[in-house]
């Protein structure tokens, strides 16, 4: 099933994208036009590049994907943009990756698994498992360091 990664923007995000690329033949990316060209070209998958601050760009890019993996920035500036994009999308599964606590608006989104992590520890395994399963448990999951 097609998966789209929204806002991968650092080397740890790239590791997750690389893992998803190995297990999913139809990997898509929505990347900020502010990212370095060398980083954008290092990522696998079909790329859409646009304004990460425009939720309509993101929701349009998710069209046709089954699963969306949203990489939230450390200071959660994109939170409301992601929420609007998800609400306007047809995604059947959303995996939201964040170091911040979720709020009620996020947890009330349908079909959402919220993975809260500390410095990406043990995150990749959890993302790959959730993306590959036919059925998953939705809601908030704290990823421990051990």
Placement of each model-derived feature along the sequence:
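N-terminal Rossmann NAD(P)H-binding glycine-rich loop of SDR-like oxidoreductase domains
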Residues: 1-29
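Structural motif corresponding to alpha-helix initiation and N-cap regions
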Residues: 14, 52-55, 76-80
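Conserved Rossmann-fold NAD(P)-dependent oxidoreductase catalytic core, especially the SDR/UDP-sugar
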Residues: 26-30, 34-35, 66-67, 79-121
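A short helix-to-beta-strand connector/capping loop
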Residues: 41-46, 108-112
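Conserved Rossmann-fold cofactor-binding substructure of NAD(P)-dependent oxidoreductases
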Residues: 42-66
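Conserved NAD(P)H cofactor-binding loop of Rossmann-fold oxidoreductase domains
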Residues: 72-74, 98-99
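Conserved beta-loop-beta element that borders a ligand/cofactor-binding pocket
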Residues: 106-145
């Amino acid at each position: 099933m097609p998966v789209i990664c929204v806002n991968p923007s650092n080397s740890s995000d790239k590791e997750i994208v690389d893992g998803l690329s190995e297990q999913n033949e139809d990997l898509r990316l929505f990347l900020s036009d502010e990212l370095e060209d060398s980083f954008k070209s290092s990522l696998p998958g079909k790329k859409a590049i646009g304004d990460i601050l425009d939720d309509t760009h993101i929701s349009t890019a998710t069209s046709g994907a089954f699963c969306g993996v949203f990489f939230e920035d450390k200071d959660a500036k994109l939170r409301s943009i992601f929420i609007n994009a998800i609400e306007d999308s047809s995604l059947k599964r959303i995996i939201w990756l964040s170091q911040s606590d979720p709020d009620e608006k996020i947890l009330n989104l349908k079909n959402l698994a919220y993975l809260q992590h500390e410095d990406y520890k043990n995150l990749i395994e959890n993302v790959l498992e959730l993306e590959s399963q036919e059925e998953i448990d939705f809601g908030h999951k704290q990823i421990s360091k051990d």
